[in-house]
Amino acid sequence: MNDQTPIGSGCPVHQPGGVRSLLGRTNKDWWPDMLATEILTPNGPSNPMGEDFDYAKAFKSLDYYALKDDLKALMTDSQPWWPADYGHYGPFFIRMAWHAAGTYRTADGRGGANSGQQRFAPLDSWPDNGNLDKARRLLWPIKQKYGNKISWADLFILAGNVAIESMGGPVFGFGGGRVDVYEPERDIYWGSEDKWVNQGVQTRIDPAKGMETIEGPLAAIQMGLIYVNPEGPQGNPHDDEGMARDMKETFKRMAMNDEETVALTAGGHTFGKAHGNGDPSLLGPAPAGSDLAAQGFGWVSSHESGGIGEHAVTSGIEGAWTNTPREWTENYFRLLFDYDYELVKSPAGAWQWQPINQKEEDMAPAAWDPGIKVPTMMTTADMALKRDPAYRAISERFRNDHEAFKDAFARAWFKLTHRDMGPKVRYLGPEVPDEDLIWQDPIPAGTKPSDAEVQAVKDKIAASGLTVSQLIKTAWASASTFRKSDFRGGANGARVRLAPQKDWEVNEPAMLARVLDTLDGLRGSLSMADAIVLGGVVGLEKAIRDAGFNVAVPFTGGRGDATQEQTDVESFEVMEPEADAFRNYVGKKKLAVKVEEMMLDKASLLGLSVPEMTVLIGGLRVLGANHGERGHGHFTRRSGQLTNDFFVNLLDMTNVWKAVEGSNDQEYVATDRTTGGETWRATRADLIFGSNSELRAVAEVYAENGHEEKFVRDFVKAWTKVMNADRFDLA
């Protein structure tokens, strides 16, 4: 986190004069409100590794400790094209790893280091990621050497770990398993601003209205920042209250509490320096807008030195935080508290704080010449650790108990760099910690039931009186919390029976409690997690039989049951759906985006394709899975049977649709063209399958004569995919 805000990032788009783009105006240019169905088709043919490549298998063949040795050697192998500060690249790689992981946000689980997105626009060209293109390029010889045995995503984080270790710092462990993608992720919302932080863009917090004014699911304070503006809110270094507010809110949205925030800030700033010893106007465009000959390098300086070493400019802030910038020491807190500070401007014009009357022994060596002494500095964000009462109390405790600080930093760094990897069962490598951590959403290992045990429980559920609707709703409520973004949620653990999920409005708590109580009494030796999914199998197979088909629904047991003590309630609260198109549910909160767009977002998090989303919506409607007794989209006279009636009746041209007056275009009614009588009611999440051309094309397939059984089989396949989405033990 050493360099947050490059000042001269330049325009991210470069178009030589007189040359048109290949495609011209896109559909989205002509119709900005067009549904972005492309987010459900990510990372397809662009992946050169092919579908058969097994990264976990490749990683297990890696000479892990030889790789670590090579990384350690790189730390002090300074290159003339980008010299190492203090002769050590460690701080540079810490910042690279931090910024790879630091884009994570809890609201939707997106961002983070998991897929190596820092290699692609917009992240490779964010102002806050200035000059990290050089850090990645320094790693290339090592990546080239070890090939597909180590992903870029894993290499970024491991390089950060080795950097800390090589400077005497503490680490808690490392888990591999991050799989690279080969194009920018299409399903992530970074904000609607059209200017970067250094181009006058406003903060996302309205102080008059409170911290919640940051638009969900965003976490960073301004466009192009990982966290906060280190100079202060809106660049105002005098706003102490605002600085602490910004830090607390943005770190909270990235899954960090106050203690973790202090530990990460102080620990990260124990190392290295910020760069602002030059004129930012000399910097060229960011990588995404740089010249072809630059070969992916951005922020190239026209300074006679090339803007490297002594003259490097990144954030604009200049200097080291401590007098020992390549060692893990206690000096960060000592210098922060032992000195009074005055506000100064760096050579690049950025606000920073300098110790008053600093002793020579407390000054830092110049990064380019250890024989020169220069003052240390603190950013406005650092000063918040001293000036904010809550942060100060934690900082003073850490200053007086360095072992506690070491442990807190190591654990916070591990959480920062692994938060988006899901449960520990996904971790690879010899340095995975044994300890289970609550933010990993631990689940006790399950026991796979025998076929006889499964059949016995199926028979009991079938005779219990539970309806198809109840069984389908309960299984969906349990499994559909899964997010492929950070691998949280899902049916394993049966957390639908625990707080907070058991009380979510979307889950119909009273109905849910009755069904769970019944299943608990019938499950025998099966886990509740297995019983819930098996209940869905029973309901679905009945619906299939009643529709006249003979299609089995797969079931693989072996799920475990989490306890309330293993469940961080606050971290799960952010996962409560504001809307769920699969259940035709819209909560009381005013939505920031359209229901049909939230449907795509949910489908994307579930890892569904357009056909999978479409077949699930159509099937769930006729199975009675709507929230409550809502009849919208229930286009069938054969409720509880798995038929294609939803699509047949949606596409029936005898219906004329109109928005219900006063519904703000959220509800619609169909009338018969001939009689004028009401036939159906629908929501936006229903009619979009007849309105949007891509979704209609798929809906037509499922409405065609002869495709009735195809619809059933496709529904079963998509349903099973969701039920097993978090079964990493089956991979």
UniProtKB/Swiss-Prot annotation:
Any single GO BP term: cellular response to hydrogen peroxide
Modification comment: Formation of the three residue Trp-Tyr-Met cross-link is important for the catalase, but not the peroxidase activity of the enzyme.
CC annotations in GO: cytosol
Cross-link Tryptophyl-tyrosyl-methioninium (Tyr-Met) (with W-98) placement: 227-254
Cofactor(s) in the UniProt record: heme b
Source taxon at top rank: Bacteria
Keyword Cytoplasm applies: no
Catalytic activities: H2O2 + AH2 = A + 2 H2O; 2 H2O2 = O2 + 2 H2O
EC number: 1.11.1.21
Alphabetical keyword list: Heme, Hydrogen peroxide, Iron, Metal-binding, Oxidoreductase, Peroxidase
Function: Bifunctional enzyme with both catalase and broad-spectrum peroxidase activity.
Name this polypeptide is given: Catalase-peroxidase
Organism in which the protein naturally occurs: Sphingopyxis alaskensis (strain DSM 13593 / LMG 18877 / RB2256)
